[in-house]
Amino acid sequence: MSPTYLPIFKPPISINLKHKRPKKRTIGRRELVDFPELELFEIEAKIDTGAYTSALHCTDIREERLDDGALVIRCRFMDESHPNYNGKAFEFREFALRDIKNSFGEVERRFVITTTLRIFNEEITTEFSLSNRGSLKFPILIGRKILRDRFLIDVKKKNLSFKEKRRMRRLVKKKSQ
């Protein structure tokens, strides 16, 4: 009887690849953020890990059909009582209509747009739902979708991005003198 040869099992080569993740920035429970495309600057935003989608306060939200048949939404950001209100109407040709849970757990149908948020001098293009937040303290809500893999929240602090922005302005001003 001839001997039976079994193949030698070779375990797969283990390669320890450490993915270089960008360092997460620490932000506070509130931050002053910019929306350059919407001409809104230093708007106070609430950081909310309980919310998945971020929200922007706007008024006069309406869907309209143009002469060419295209659907658009038009709105104004903030409201007349807000110091950053500029009264300018914005039009968006690219948008979605989604069901989003509000802070009371009720599902609301909201328009969602893509725009650029600037925080810590980093521009993040992301989605925001449009909502009338006039009765709420903060006109902007930053949810987990933006926070994930980018930021850590220190609830004892606030406006860390703005403080860094102000410090950088002072440095530039000193250098130019």
Q: Model-predicted segments: where are they?
A:
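Pepsin/retropepsin-fold aspartyl endopeptidases
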Residues: S2-Q177
